[in-house]
């Protein structure tokens, strides 16, 4: 340990081994690598997500030759000892013996990455996030550059000691690894960072739609680079759209506060009748909450004045009207041109009643019904839809407190009417909990082992109190779709747990098994619907579309992780094919439209709602867009939909090739409509979908994809700016023309709102000034579990969603989301 180098014998000398500087893929193909992360070759050939470097390339000599090795200077040695550059983490404290073995974080090789479920996401994310937050003084000029060893440099005692400590930690880690594997052989344990993606305030699981968008690294790199390069035009458009959306949000917030003071106000009776009928024929026919005959009886008594109306019923009626008005898309029925403001006021009023102290009816079946209506209204009217998962936890606990999770057969004295109402309500509670957990990418709060409540009987509401004999399964009733959903609930819950679990990591055979069970359940539902007797009532288009959405979305989420790896591994080709076919099935909808029905009911919901009615379609659009791009760029195989899932969509080969492109362009047009008059101002998704279309067109013509993506982003932002200006002007004009609101007693109540204090239309055209600080990407850091802490430089209030994905810098996407007050701004 005197620091002098020990000369090696002549017989023990070996050839000088040059350090490995190229990435793994370029080194195997023996081509020149520019040593970037990712390198230009991997980025050009579509392997950016798997561009990795050999971490321990400079320590390949035997242990006995360690004192004679040439090393770098101490600063560079400490830089390369980072977990992203070496196999082990170097302890920073003096207590070397107290360094826990868990700090040793080996970087998996490419083979290990493909063999694991989400290791590619973990490796690239870990590499980029660590290099981003590393001290600039210890960062090489090039990210992929590893300094060469020079003969003039000699190892110091500290360097030799550090190397010895590394070897000891490796030995301790290798000795403890078999013990942990024997303790839990059925659970594949891994780094927690590999199981989830962390943002500033949100933890997204594998069922979130942003996971699929991680494949479009070209789009995100191009837009991020343009923002960071101070592109005046692009940044100015970005600022104007952002500030306009905030101004619209303030106007909606002002209106909601004013309308909330109008207690008991309702639209006209004619408008209420249309909205109530729309709700009963759509959502109430699939997600059973109310007993329709009883509800209509009290509703008619309210207008005639024969019986006093309770506050609880009025709250239910307001939410039913809000949902029905969204279905029929007639906002003028609610007495205001801005339906979102009135829906927000009604939702806030119902939530205040649910959380008010001293309300004994909260812990009752009526209270559970109101709670379900509140959550459904938030989803349909895009009011805090991304936070519904948090509220479903309280709903589930209230339902369990009432014993809805236990089958009514355990209570012999309970009437048949009450027993069936409880079964229907429990089915709806389970569905809301499961769907909201999938939207947010979090583990489901329910387990099939924790309840024994059976599905409801196949009875109509009119026969519920007169007979207990259910109808045959081929007779459509008001509970037929609830029975179908409850039948496939166990496999869907299992899929949701597999996707968003922290500890369990399923094998591909397990995914195939779950996919087979889920596909069989979907096919069973299809066969049951086809077997409905033609002499009785037939299912509506809304019922068919909603049933497909609630079931097929789990099949898409289940195969999505392996479909992303199918481009490099043929073993996952089946997942890629299933994802494409399921995505087309979700986007295209039911191939035939039943005659004599309201065909626009579901289209209006899909156009204006959020959460459940937006996220699955975004994931399906991203899946279809990536498949089209792969085929256009000359991928090694083409994945055409030919299975029974889409056989109704493609009768000829030429038509089959056009179906993915058609459904993708249709949804891009639908997202543009959401900007114009939707409750949620969703700028981010519209810009990203437009960039996907532009990248596909550029790949078809052979033009540069970066230029096409940037041009599409600018054009889409300009269109967003025009739309938002029109919306703001219409809001300003409507403030001067109050709309009459009718109380159920018959009086008119005028509503007039004052002007706001800020005129956002006078925005600086150059985007300079205070707006530049709104999206300073240099001040945002990443929180990845406990490894990084949010510093005071982070602007959490301005960044509604901070997402870090493998090999991507999502700082650009964080502010591309603006909603009306209470609408989702975190799941975009």
Curated annotation (Swiss-Prot):
DNA-binding interval(s): 23-51
Location of the protein in the cell: Nucleus
Disruption phenotype: Results in significantly reduced expression of the leporins biosynthesis gene cluster.
Species of the source: Aspergillus flavus (strain ATCC 200026 / FGSC A1120 / IAM 13836 / NRRL 3357 / JCM 12722 / SRRC 167)
Region (Disordered): 1-20
Function: Transcription factor involved in regulation of gene cluster 23 that mediates the biosynthesis of leporins.
One annotated GO biological process: DNA-templated transcription
SMART domains found in the cross-reference section: Fungal_trans, GAL4
Any one cellular-component term (Gene Ontology): nucleus
Stretch forming the signal peptide: none
GO molecular function, a single term: DNA-binding transcription activator activity, RNA polymerase II-specific
Protein origin, superkingdom: Eukaryota
Keyword entries, A-Z: DNA-binding, Metal-binding, Nucleus, Transcription, Transcription regulation, Zinc
Protein name: Transcription factor lepE
Matches recorded under SUPFAM superfamilies: Zn2/Cys6 DNA-binding domain (SSF57701)
Name of one Pfam family that matches: Zn_clus
InterPro entries linked: Fungal_TF_Env_Response, Transcription_factor_dom_fun, Zn2-C6_fun-type_DNA-bd_sf, Zn2Cys6_DnaBD
PROSITE patterns (UniProt xref): ZN2_CY6_FUNGAL_1 (PS00463), ZN2_CY6_FUNGAL_2 (PS50048)
């Amino acid at each position: 340990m005197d620091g002098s180098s020990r000369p090696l014998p002549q017989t023990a000398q070996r050839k000088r081994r040059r350090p490995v500087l190229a990435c793994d893929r370029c080194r195997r193909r023996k081509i020149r690598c520019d040593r970037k992360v990712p390198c230009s070759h991997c980025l050009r050939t579509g392997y950016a997500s798997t561009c990795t470097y050999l971490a321990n390339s400079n320590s390949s000599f035997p242990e006995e030759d360690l004192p004679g090795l040439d090393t770098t200077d101490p600063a560079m040695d400490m830089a390369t000892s980072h977990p992203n550059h070496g196999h082990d983490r170097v302890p920073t404290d003096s207590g070397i013996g107290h360094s826990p073995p868990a700090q040793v974080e080996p970087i998996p090789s490419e083979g290990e990455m493909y063999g694991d479920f989400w290791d590619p996401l973990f490796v690239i994310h870990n590499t980029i996030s660590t290099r981003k937050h590393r001290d600039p003084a210890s960062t090489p000029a090039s990210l992929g550059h590893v300094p060469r060893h020079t003969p003039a440099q000699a190892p110091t005692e500290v360097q030799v000691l550090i190397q010895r400590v590394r070897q000891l930690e490796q030995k301790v880690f290798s000795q403890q690894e078999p013990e942990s594997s024997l303790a839990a052989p059925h659970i594949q344990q891994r780094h927690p960072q590999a199981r989830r993606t962390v943002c500033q305030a949100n933890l997204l699981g594998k069922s979130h739609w942003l996971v699929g968008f991680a494949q479009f690294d070209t789009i995100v790199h191009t837009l991020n680079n343009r923002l960071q390069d101070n592109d005046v035009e692009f940044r100015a458009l970005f600022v104007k759209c952002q500030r306009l959306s905030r101004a619209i949000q303030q106007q909606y917030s002002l209106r909601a506060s004013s309308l909330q003071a109008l207690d008991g106000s309702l639209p006209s009776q004619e408008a209420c009748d249309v909205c109530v009928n729309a709700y009963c024929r759509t959502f109430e026919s699939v997600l059973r909450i109310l007993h329709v005959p009883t509800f209509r009886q009290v509703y008619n008594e309210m207008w005639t004045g024969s019986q006093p109306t309770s506050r609880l019923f009025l709250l239910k009626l307001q939410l039913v009207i809000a949902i029905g008005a969204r279905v029929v898309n007639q906002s003028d029925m609610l007495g205001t041109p801005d339906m979102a403001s009135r829906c927000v006021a009604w939702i806030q009023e119902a939530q205040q009643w649910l959380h008010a102290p001293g309300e004994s009816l909260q812990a009752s079946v009526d209270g559970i019904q109101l709670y379900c209506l509140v959550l459904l209204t938030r989803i349909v009217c895009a009011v805090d839809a991304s936070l519904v998962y948090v509220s479903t936890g309280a709903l589930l606990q209230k339902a369990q407190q009432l014993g809805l999770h236990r089958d009514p057969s355990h209570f012999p004295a309970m009437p048949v009417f009450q027993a069936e109402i409880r079964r229907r309500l429990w089915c709806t509670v389970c569905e809301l909990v499961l769907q909201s957990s999938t939207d947010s990418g979090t583990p489901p709060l329910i387990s099939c082992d924790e309840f024994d409540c059976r599905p409801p009987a196949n009875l109509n509401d009119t026969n519920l109190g007169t007979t207990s004999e259910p109808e045959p399964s081929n007779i459509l009733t008001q509970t037929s779709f609830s029975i179908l959903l409850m039948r496939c609930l166990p496999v869907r819950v299992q899929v949701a747990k597999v996707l968003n679990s922290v500890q369990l990591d399923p094998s591909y055979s397990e995914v195939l098994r779950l996919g087979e069970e889920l596909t069989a359940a979907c096919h069973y539902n299809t066969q049951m619907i086809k077997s409905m007797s033609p002499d009785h009532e037939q299912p509506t288009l809304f019922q068919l579309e909603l049933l497909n959405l609630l079931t097929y979305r789990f099949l898409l989420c289940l195969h999505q992780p392996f479909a992303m790896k199918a481009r490099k591994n043929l073993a996952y080709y089946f997942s890629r094919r299933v994802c494409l076919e399921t995505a087309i099935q979700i986007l295209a909808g039911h191939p035939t439209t039943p005659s004599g029905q309201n065909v626009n009911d579901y289209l209006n919901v899909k156009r204006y709602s959020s959460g459940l009615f937006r996220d699955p379609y975004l994931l399906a659009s991203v899946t279809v867009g990536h498949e089209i791009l792969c085929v256009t760029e000359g991928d090694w195989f083409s994945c055409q939909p030919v299975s029974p899932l889409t056989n109704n969509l493609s009768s000829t080969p030429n038509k089959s090739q056009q179906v993915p492109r058609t459904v993708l362009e249709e949804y891009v047009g639908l997202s543009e409509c959401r900007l114009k008059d939707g409750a949620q101002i969703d700028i981010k998704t519209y810009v990203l979908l437009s960039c996907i279309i532009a990248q596909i067109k550029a790949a078809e013509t052979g033009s540069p994809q970066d230029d096409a993506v940037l041009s599409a982003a600018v054009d889409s932002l300009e269109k967003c700016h025009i739309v938002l200006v029109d919306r703001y002007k219409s809001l300003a004009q409507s403030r001067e023309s109050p709309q009459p609101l009718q109380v159920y007693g018959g009086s008119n109540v005028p509503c007039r709102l004052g002007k706001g204090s800020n005129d956002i239309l006078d925005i600086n055209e150059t985007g300079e000034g205070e707006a530049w600080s709104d999206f300073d990407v240099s001040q945002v850091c990443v929180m990845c579990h406990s490894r990084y802490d949010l510093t005071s430089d982070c602007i959490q209030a301005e960044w509604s969603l901070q997402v870090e994905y493998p090999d991507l810098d999502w700082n650009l996407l964080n502010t591309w989301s603006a909603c009306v007050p209470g609408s989702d701004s975190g799941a975009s």
